[in-house]
Every structure is written in structure tokens, then in C-alpha cells.
């Protein structure tokens, strides 16, 4: 991801064996007993991942079926969610009570291997739009909205294969929403048309993510049916391409940053294009023309 990237550490089934994290009375959910420990595992038929770098307070609980909840306060960085491992080009239904205060994402999030790719279908976010540090590739129309497609590169960053250099693919919805159906096959097909192919699916979750922020999120995930093959036989209703360049609208060369100059980052008010090179994400606060 563009503003914070997470390595979801796989642990053995024995390590992840958990006491059920909810108390029940006459079949009714009363209170969570304790936070689910960080790690990966299965819960009520769904794969889940919970990673935190330990900063601030983050409490994650698995709920019934595809439900989970997470509350965070002054958290440094975390990613949590439920879904599938492996993922697929499926339609995913979700509902969320998503209440971020600061930098946060609500997305369909996953990885592929060969090539190693981290991807986001971003449905809602907090105060930071990651597009400012990404390269715009085109647009697609799916599920009643336009999505802008972006690409980013992470260099020597954590991944599901350890520290690595890999690409990120993003679809960012033009109108935020906290519930609906995401036809992932449309995004995967559009990305391929735009020169952004996925490889073999790894895990795929509806994730809540936070970075130096607070908030709460309760999400229910369900498969909505539809295509489950790695390559969708049908594509989105429309796809358009844009020339390679920064995520913002093109600016005259004279107003773009020079090679090795800053071109993005949270709070950056200067040029977001490069007169030479490409705007590359470095960290949450700094992107550079390289």
C-alpha cells in the first residue's frame, strides 16, 4: 500500500488456536472477552488476518460467520480483516460500520505471487487519499461507480515473501461507500488491460487498515457469487487508459519537480508531477522523482 505496508505474519495452526473471543448468553452476543491475538487463521469458515506493529492500542475480534470488529486508539499501523485464502476473481458483498478518525482504509485487499503484487480495491478511506503518491493508469466502471486505477512500487518493503520489491495495484472508488458488492473480476480484467497483470492468488480479505489514527470498524463479509476463475471471461463495463504519469492532473513541465525532487506525500502542497523520471513513493510523507 502507498502510505503503509504490512507483512501479515503467518503462524502455525497450533499457534493460532484461540479461545472463542465472545461471550454468549442464551445465544445472544453480549461482550467480547478479549482481543484475538495477532496472526492468521480460520474462524467460522473464513480466513482472517490481523497484523499490528504494536504501536498504540488495537483490539480485534472475530465474530460470527464473516463478521469482525476492530477498535484502535493512537495506533501506529495495523491491518485486519476476514476473507479467503486463496482469493479468487469473485464477487464480494460487505457491510461495514466504518468510523475512522484519521488515516485509514476500507478495502478488498490481497496479494498475488508470480508476480508478487499487493492490491487494493479501495471503497472508503479516512483523511488521506493514497492517490497522491501513485501513478494513474486509467479508469474503469463497475458496481455503479467509476474507479481510478493506479500503480505504485514498493522497494525493499515487507511482503508475504519477506522483504522484497513489488508493485501495488489500486482501484479507488470515486464515491466512498461502506457497504455493497465488489465485482473483483472487473477490476482484475481492467488491470490486465492496463498492463497490470496478477499472478497466482494468495489471501484476499475485506480489510480495515489504520495508520497513526484512531477509530472503529465492524465489518461483515460474504461471497456474493459470480466468477471465481483467476482470469475473468468478461470485463468491466468500460475501461479507459491514461498516459503514464503522476496521479494528479498533468501540469506544465515548468511546474513539475525536477529529477530527485519531492513530488508527493501527506501534507505536501508542491508539484505532484515530474519533469524527469517518475514519481515514486518512498514513505507516508515523501515521494520522489526517480
UniProtKB/Swiss-Prot annotation:
User: Which Pfam families does the record associate with it?
Assistant: CBM_1, Glyco_hydro_11
Q: Which reaction does it catalyse?
A: Endohydrolysis of (1->4)-beta-D-xylosidic linkages in xylans
Glyco sites are at 26
- Signal peptide residues are 1-19
Q: Record's superkingdom?
A: Eukaryota
Q: Where in the cell is it found?
A: Secreted
Question: What EC number(s) would the UniProt record show?
Answer: 3.2.1.8
Q: What is its main location?
A: secreted
Q: Does the keyword Glycoprotein apply?
A: yes
- List, as start-end ranges, the regions of compositional bias called Low complexity: 234-248
Q: Name the catalytic site residues.
A: 118 (nucleophile), 209 (proton donor)
Q: Which residues form the GH11 domain?
A: 34-222
| Keywords noted in UniProt | Carbohydrate metabolism, Glycoprotein, Glycosidase, Hydrolase, Polysaccharide degradation, Secreted, Signal, Xylan degradation
GO MF annotation terms: cellulose binding; endo-1,4-beta-xylanase activity
Family, as annotated: Belongs to the glycosyl hydrolase 11 (cellulase G) family.
**Protein name as annotated:** Endo-1,4-beta-xylanase B
Q: What organism is the protein native to?
A: Phanerodontia chrysosporium (White-rot fungus)
Amino acid at each position: 500500500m502507498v502510505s503503509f505496508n504490512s507483512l501479515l505474519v503467518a503462524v502455525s495452526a497450533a499457534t493460532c488456536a484461540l479461545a472463542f473471543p465472545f461471550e454468549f448468553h442464551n445465544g445472544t452476543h453480549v461482550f467480547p472477552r478479549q482481543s484475538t491475538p495477532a496472526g492468521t487463521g480460520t474462524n467460522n469458515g473464513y480466513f482472517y488476518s490481523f497484523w499490528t506493529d504494536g504501536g498504540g492500542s488495537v483490539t480485534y475480534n472475530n465474530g460470527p460467520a464473516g463478521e469482525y470488529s476492530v477498535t484502535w486508539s493512537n495506533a501506529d499501523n495495523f491491518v485486519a480483516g476476514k476473507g479467503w485464502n486463496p482469493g479468487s476473481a469473485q464477487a464480494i458483498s460487505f457491510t461495514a460500520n466504518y468510523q475512522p478518525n484519521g488515516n485509514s482504509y476500507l478495502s478488498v485487499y490481497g496479494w498475488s505471487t508470480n508476480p508478487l503484487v499487493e492490491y487494493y480495491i479501495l471503497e472508503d478511506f479516512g483523511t488521506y487519499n493514497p492517490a497522491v503518491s501513485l501513478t494513474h493508469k486509467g479508469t474503469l466502471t463497475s458496481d455503479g461507480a467509476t474507479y481510478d486505477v493506479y500503480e505504485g512500487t514498493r522497494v525493499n518493503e515487507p511482503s508475504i515473501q519477506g522483504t522484497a520489491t513489488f508493485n501495488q495495484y489500486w482501484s479507488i472508488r470515486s464515491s466512498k461507500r461502506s457497504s455493497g458488492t465488489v465485482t473483483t473480476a472487473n477490476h482484475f480484467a481492467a488491470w490486465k488491460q492496463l498492463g497490470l497483470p496478477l499472478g497466482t492468488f494468495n489471501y484476499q480479505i475485506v480489510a480495515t487498515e489504520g495508520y497513526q489514527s484512531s477509530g472503529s470498524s465492524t465489518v461483515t463479509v460474504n461471497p456474493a457469487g459470480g466468477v471465481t476463475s483467476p482470469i475473468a471471461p468478461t470485463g468491466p463495463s468500460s475501461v479507459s487508459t491514461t498516459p503514464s504519469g503522476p496521479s494528479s492532473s498533468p501540469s506544465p513541465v515548468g511546474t513539475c519537480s525536477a529529477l530527485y525532487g519531492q513530488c508527493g506525500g501527506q501534507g505536501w502542497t508542491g508539484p505532484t508531477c515530474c519533469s524527469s523520471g517518475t514519481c515514486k513513493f518512498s514513505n507516508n510523507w515523501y515521494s520522489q522523482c526517480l
